[in-house]
Amino acid sequence: MIYAAPGAVGAPVAFKSRYDNFIGGQFVAPLDGQYFDVITPISGKVYTQAARSTEADINLALDAAHAAKDAWGATAPAERAGVLLKIADRLEQNLEKLAYAETVDNGKPIRETLNADIP
């Protein structure tokens, strides 16, 4: 199958123009407000921007993880398993989109990403 280029009509994934950090269950801008261009090796063009995280951003993420660990640890194993299985189901439902995004990011042929990297 032939896939449309990032940003083109018919592309399996519509990339946002900018991605923030995901900390404490929400997307947050980097504290310094800086982003970097993400270039696809397929065309050499910028297809999105990503947060340029600093030590301060990492510390926020670590603080959020430490704050969440006690509640997660107190959750019954069966409930934790259910959450993880739901995540696995969502991944399986979106394998082609994930493979496309990975191919755009690393430049590998889509068949390799679909058959080796993502499953």
Show the residue positions of the predicted features.
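Terminal low-complexity tails and localization/encapsulation signals of metabolic enzymes
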Residues: M1-Q49, G82, K86
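Glycine-rich loop-to-alpha-helix module at the N-terminal edge of alpha/beta enzyme cores
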Residues: K45-P119
